[in-house]
């Protein structure tokens, strides 16, 4: 594994254990430069192609999904373990659909539904990008539809 600090490939594994949900192996690594970092090893069940709105296709990228979810969760009271479980559940649910091609709309909807239960603010943040909110009224209309806010 190449160190992200010094870019050398001289690292050793100092700790290895399965993640709590059992879907990956978490490894703590130590580089000769002294840097420590974590890597994850996951099983890829099948190759999934994402069909974009314009019809273009690209391979499903778990890291891209993860980044978009972490952006929505930024500065929210959700710990990394909870976020990783959510990302793993979402990835697994996509694989369990059993389809070789999945629309970006299906993925976005699945993430939104999960975030709705996990953190309402992250849900609105994700929706604002996914649904391409342009003006303040777009946010207001969306939030007005949320049951979470209507109950208050």
UniProtKB/Swiss-Prot annotation:
GO-annotated biological processes: negative regulation of DNA-templated transcription
GO molecular-function terms, A-Z: ATP binding; DNA binding; zinc ion binding
Entry-linked InterPro entries: ATP-cone_dom, NrdR-like_N, RNR_NrdR-like
Limits of the ATP-cone domain: 48-138
Pfam families from the UniProt entry: ATP-cone, Zn_ribbon_NrdR
Tagged with keyword Phosphoprotein: no
Cofactor note as given: Binds 1 zinc ion.
Span of zinc fingers (unnamed): 3-33
Keyword DNA damage: no
UniProt keyword list: ATP-binding, DNA-binding, Metal-binding, Nucleotide-binding, Repressor, Transcription, Transcription regulation, Zinc, Zinc-finger
Task of the protein: Negatively regulates transcription of bacterial ribonucleotide reductase nrd genes and operons by binding to NrdR-boxes.
NCBIfam families, per the entry: transcriptional regulator NrdR (TIGR00244)
Family stated for the protein in its record: Belongs to the NrdR family.
Name of the protein described by the UniProt record: Transcriptional repressor NrdR
Lineage, broadest ranks: Bacteria, Pseudomonadati, Pseudomonadota, Alphaproteobacteria, Candidatus Pelagibacterales
């Amino acid at each position: 594994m190449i160190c992200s600090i010094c870019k050398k490939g001289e690292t050793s594994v100092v700790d290895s254990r399965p993640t709590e949900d059992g879907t990956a192996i978490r490894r703590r690594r130590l580089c000769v430069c002294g840097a420590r970092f974590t890597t994850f090893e996951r099983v890829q069940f099948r190759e999934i192609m994402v069909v974009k709105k314009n019809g273009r296709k690209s391979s499903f990228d778990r890291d891209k999904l993860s980044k978009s979810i972490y952006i929505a969760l930024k500065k929210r009271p959700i710990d990394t373990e909870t976020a990783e479980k959510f990302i793993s559940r979402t990835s697994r649910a996509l694989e369990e659909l059993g389809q070789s091609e999945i629309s970006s709309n299906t993925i976005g909807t699945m993430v939104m539904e999960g975030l709705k239960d996990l953190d309402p603010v992250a849900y609105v943040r994700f929706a604002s990008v996914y649904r391409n909110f342009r003006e303040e009224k777009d946010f207001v209309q969306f939030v007005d539809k949320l049951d979470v806010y209507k109950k208050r």
